[in-house]
Design a protein with these regions (language model features):
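Conserved N-lobe ATP-binding subsite of Hanks-type protein kinase domains
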Residues: 18
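AlphaC helix of the eukaryotic protein kinase fold
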Residues: 37-60
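Activation segment of protein kinases
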Residues: 42-45, 138-183
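Activation-segment/catalytic-loop signature of the eukaryotic protein kinase fold
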Residues: 72
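Conserved short submotifs of the Hanks-type protein kinase catalytic core
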Residues: 76-90, 94
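Activation segment signature within eukaryotic-like protein kinase domains
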Residues: 108-109
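Protein kinase catalytic-loop region centered on the HRD/HxD motif
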Residues: 114-124
Length: 274
């Protein structure tokens, strides 16, 4: 890898890897490179296998609102993943700096739903949708372009035999954006992502979590018992349809949520929720 990519500076660190800004010597462009950190991976071999598997999954999703995977491999230093370098800031950073305008929120919703619709159509669920995994890039002339990052916890909607049991018996994700069925070790599907999106959009409007607590167990209980901070009280200026739509996405039981991202987008656009 080092023959082609020159690591320039770290961009971010995760549980198992570090993401670097890098230069592609062959094409003369900047890219992002994720490296597995051997000092943080309990089983480096398994971590590398997971990285390559996740790269294959993400590369199957070709969409302008999902970060593109360019290359993945293994060298003498371990596993690596090369992605397009997205300029801009995360949704988390943006909300810490300034709230979204109404138009920006509308663009966020439409583009995130478009990207996740493509992912689900490819048979992939994300399972770690959160503000840190949403990049916003200013457009020339105004507006924002949205990119969804980090499919590191993603899995096929219909995983191979045995893999579903492994996923069910493990608990991964960001607790404020996890659906009740994840805490219950129950089956997950597209509607699990839809719940996370509802939490994400609520957060984008308030900079607060719909299900919260002083400790992680308290947050989990809030999800499980649906103890939600009413959006309408925090943002009485919002259209009633927007409030009801987000409440629909964050319904306690999967069967009560939209059956697909496409359905969620259609209802959002039509402004009618029966």
């Amino acid at each position: 890898m080092n023959d082609r990519y020159e690591l320039l500076a770290p961009i971010a660190e995760g549980g198992l890897g570090t993401v670097f800004r890098a230069r592609d010597r062959q094409l003369g462009r900047e890219v992002a490179v994720k490296r597995i950190r051997a000092d943080k991976a309990q089983n480096v071999g398994s971590a590398v296998e997971a990285l390559i598997r996740d790269a294959r999954q993400q590369s199957a999703i070709q969409h302008p609102n999902i970060v593109a995977v360019l290359e993945a491999g293994v060298d003498e230093e371990g596993g690596y993943l090369v992605m397009e370098l997205v300029q801009g800031e995360t949704l988390e950073d943006r909300l810490g700096r300034a709230p979204l305008s109404g138009d920006e929120f509308d663009q966020l919703v439409r583009q995130v739903l478009a990207g996740m619709s493509a992912a689900h159509a490819a048979g992939i669920i994300h399972l770690d949708l959160k503000p840190e995994n949403i990049m916003l890039t200013p457009r020339l002339g105004g507006g924002i372009h949205v990119k969804i990052l980090d499919f590191g916890l993603a899995r096929p909607v219909a995983p191979p035999d045995g893999e579903a049991d492994i996923k069910r018996n493990s608990l991964h994700g960001s607790i404020h954006f996890m659906a009740p069925e994840q805490f219950e070790r129950a089956d997950v599907d597209e509607r699990t992502d839809i719940y996370a999106l509802g939490c994400l959009f609520y957060y984008a409007l308030t900079h607060l979590h719909p299900f919260d607590g002083d400790t992680k167990p308290q947050v989990m209980v809030a999800h499980l018992y649906h103890r939600v901070n009413p959006l309408g009280k925090l943002r009485p200026d919002l259209p009633a349809h927007t409030v009801r739509w987000i409440e629909w996405l964050t319904s306690r039981h999967p069967a009560e949520r939209p059956s697909s991202v496409a359905e969620a987008l259609k209802v959002y656009e039509n402004g009618v929720l029966s």
